[in-house]
Every structure is written in structure tokens, then in C-alpha cells.
From Swiss-Prot:
EC class name: oxidoreductase
Family stated for the protein in its record: Belongs to the dihydroorotate dehydrogenase family. Type 1 subfamily.
Annotated gene: pyrD
Subcellular location: Cytoplasm
Record: active site: C117 (nucleophile)
Role this protein plays: Catalyzes the conversion of dihydroorotate to orotate with NAD(+) as electron acceptor.
Biological-process GO terms, alphabetical: 'de novo' pyrimidine nucleobase biosynthetic process; 'de novo' UMP biosynthetic process
Record key words, sorted: Cytoplasm, Flavoprotein, FMN, NAD, Oxidoreductase, Pyrimidine biosynthesis
Reactions mediated catalytically: (S)-dihydroorotate + NAD(+) = orotate + NADH + H(+)
Binding residue positions for FMN: S12, K35, T36, N114, K153, V179, G199, G226, G227, G248, S249
Species assigned in the record: Thermotoga maritima (strain ATCC 43589 / DSM 3109 / JCM 10099 / NBRC 100826 / MSB8)
Protein name per its UniProtKB record: Dihydroorotate dehydrogenase B (NAD(+)), catalytic subunit
Entry's EC annotation: 1.3.1.14
A cellular component term, taken from the record's GO annotations: cytoplasm
Amino acid sequence: MLELKPPLVLLSGPAGFGEYLKLMDHRYVGGVLLKTVTLHPKEGNPTPRMADSDFYVINRIGLENPGIHAFVENIPELPVPMIASLGGDSFEEYLEVARVFKKVADRFYAVEFNFSCPNVKEGGLSIVKNAEEWKKLLNTLRKELPDSFLIAKVGVEGIFVEDAAEFVMKTGWDGITLVNTVRGLHFEKDTMILGGLSGPVLKPIALRAVYEVKKRFPELFVIASGGVYSVKDAEEFLKVGADVIGVGSALFKDPGVVEEIGKYLLEVKR
């Protein structure tokens, strides 16, 4: 089982490549889940890329990243454990990204594969919808990275999280991140912004997902992702069995909340 002290990570996407650590006391951060990296560099989507309200954030970054080859040559040096995040648009791309990453895998605490980005044309979603292909990919990646702690990042669209968790367990993976953003739409005056929905509005969905998965597979490692903006939010995710609490879009609102949650997680008895 992966152990982080405190059991709190800055989530892939908002955390970038660890830049937000400069804004907080890293003693209260257990680790950083780095920005998702793909086989080829991605420029991301055109602006506007973000929109928010009191209850949600819509982002359509589009997995902007330098590509896996540039990434392995410029791995950030951070004072906390790093978890890599890898993505792809096809079976072959996921496999090639894993092969390149394998050269530096021992520098990371774990590696997450993003199978659920809603802001790019494919982003792994099409593979997850094809159960047999996804199971084949999970098996192949497990064999490619036999010594890594493997985490699958999934959403709630295209597959039931309990089924996704079962595939992850049966193929020898170690954990799952629940949940990624869901598709949303926001109007900024007359501009329509389509992207991934996150923030407080996502918390009830994420809580239910974590609850259902841990009820059925208590031994599966779960990173809770979705609407953690306060100590109370973190407490509720612990109650449904989350092993690690992820903080994402809250970083845009108030990075200071990370220290508050981190202090709580260091003190709480589990």
C-alpha cells in the first residue's frame, strides 16, 4: 500500500509540475500528482480555457504538455514524492508512453494512467468504453511496468466505477483515482464554454464513487478527487474509505486550504 504523510496530494492538472508548492508549506503535502504527459507534445485548446462560479469550475485545457520525451529529460526536483500521470489517444500511444517512462520509473513514487480526460478528442475515454480492449491495455501496461505502483484515473462517464475498479483489480493494478471531471457547459456572456466540470458540485458524485468502490473492493487503494475545498470535505471522503485526499481546483481559489487539510490529516486517527 502506498503511504503518504499526510495522505494528501495535489492533483494532476491544477498542480502542474509542482509549481504550486512554492505557495505553501510542503510539510503538509504528501505528494504531487504531476500534469498528464502524452506521447507527443500538446498545445491544448484555444482560449477561453477556464470558467467558474461559486459552485463549480469548468476547464478545457486539453492536456497541454511537453510530451513524454521532453518530460523524462526535464523531471522536476520537488521536496515531496512525485506521482507521474501518463495519457494517450490510443492503445499504441499508451504503450509507447509507458515504454519511454520506464527508463525513469524508479524516480517516481507511483504512476497514474489517465483514462478519462473529457477535454480532448479521445483521451482514453474510447478505450474505457470498450471493456475488452481496456482490460487488454491494463494487462499490457502492468507487464510493461511490473515494479511500479499503478493507478488508473477514471471518470463516471462511459463505465460504472465499480466495473472499472474490478478491471483494475483483476489486472493486477494497485489503485484508482476517483473521479475525473465530468462534461459540463458554461456560458460566459455569449461565449459557450464546454469542458470538464469540477469543484464543490462534483463532491456528491465523487463521494458516492469512492463509497461504492471501497465497499466492494476495500483493499483497492483510492485517491479521492472531486470537490475537496475544506477540512470537512476531506473528513467526509475519509468516512467513505478514501486512502488519500486529492486537492485540485481548490488551488485556484485558495492554495492555503492545502495546509489546513494537511494539518488535519496528520492529526486524525484512521
